[in-house]
């Protein structure tokens, strides 16, 4: 059988993967701090006794676009935005430490601070705040709680956000959307990052997603047309093989 059917099939498979990545990016176009996922492909020439006229395609090392998103001023005390290489530490489902740029902090029914359901990690572990307290976050990540009835100038720190610094090449996104240290980074910096006291946050501000929704929609349309073309190639190769078999049977 002509190798073209295999090359077209491989290309169609990778096109579906590209569509899945683009769909995920579109779904997170309004997620604070989201970093668009990249999908890179590379050509792999087919080696063998036949002429080198066919080339397969395979996925290359995936990654994320670390371009900062635009800043949205929300005036909400629990919304924070970080510097370019700054990350918030959170606790993942398996108890390990992960990192996110999403600064939309919520308070769960038990008083624990969370981001997308993940407990926010402070310098002394997960952070909890008193029920009904007015929460403020300072530029250095210190969280203070003002209980009802307390004087307005009362400062009662309840914890401090663990702010860490890492470049895009040092972290990898997990299936839950939380970034973790790559194996290479763990070998040089340890299993978790240490808090960086030089980092600062802006309270009442959220960094938006860096997904370009218009470009992502264009990519979806282009991927759909590319997939359709690849299916036509497979169909044409199959038809040609059928006609060749008919000619051989006639002879």
Swiss-Prot record:
It is found in: Bacterial flagellum basal body. Belongs to the flagella basal body rod proteins family. Keywords: Bacterial flagellum. SUPFAM superfamilies: Flagellar hook protein flgE. NCBIfam families: FlgEFG_subfam, PRK12640.1. Its main location: other. The keyword ATP-binding does not apply. This is Flagellar basal-body rod protein FlgF. GO terms for biological process: bacterial-type flagellum-dependent cell motility; bacterial-type flagellum-dependent swarming motility; chemotaxis. The basal body constitutes a major portion of the flagellar organelle and consists of five rings (E,L,P,S, and M) mounted on a central rod. The rod consists of about 26 subunits of FlgG in the distal portion, and FlgB, FlgC and FlgF are thought to build up the proximal portion of the rod with about 6 subunits each. It holds the Pfam family Flg_bb_rod. The keyword tRNA-binding does not apply. GO terms for cellular component: bacterial-type flagellum; bacterial-type flagellum basal body, rod. InterPro entries: Flag_bb_rod_N (IPR001444), Flagellar_basal_body_rod_CS (IPR019776), Flagellar_FlgE/F/G (IPR020013), Flg_bb/hook_C_dom (IPR010930), FlgE/F/G-like (IPR037925), LlgE_F_G-like_D1 (IPR053967).
């Amino acid at each position: 059988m002509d190798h073209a059917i295999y090359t077209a099939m491989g290309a169609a498979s990778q096109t579906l993967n590209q569509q899945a990545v683009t769909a995920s990016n579109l779904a997170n176009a309004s997620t604070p701090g989201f970093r668009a996922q990249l999908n890179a492909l590379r050509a792999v020439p087919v080696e063998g006794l036949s002429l080198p006229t066919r080339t397969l395609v395979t996925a290359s090392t995936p990654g994320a676009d670390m371009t900062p998103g635009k800043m949205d001023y929300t005036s909400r005390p629990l919304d924070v935005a970080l510097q370019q290489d700054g990350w918030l530490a959170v606790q993942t489902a398996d108890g390990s430490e992960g990192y996110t740029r999403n600064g939309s902090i919520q308070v769960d029914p038990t008083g624990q601070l969370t981001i997308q359901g993940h407990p926010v990690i402070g310098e002394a572990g997960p952070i909890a705040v008193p029920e009904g307290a007015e929460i403020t976050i300072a530029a250095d990540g210190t969280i203070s709680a003002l209980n009802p009835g307390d004087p307005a100038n009362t400062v009662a720190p309840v914890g401090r956000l663990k702010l860490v610094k890492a470049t895009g090449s040092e972290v990898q996104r997990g299936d839950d959307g939380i970034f973790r240290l790559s194996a290479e980074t763990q070998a040089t910096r340890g299993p978790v990052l240490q808090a960086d006291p030089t980092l600062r946050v802006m309270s009442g501000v959220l960094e938006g997603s860096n997904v370009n929704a218009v470009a992502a929609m264009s990519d979806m349309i282009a991927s759909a047309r590319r997939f359709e073309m690849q299916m036509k190639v497979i169909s044409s190769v199959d038809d040609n093989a059928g006609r060749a078999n008919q000619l051989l049977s006639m002879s």
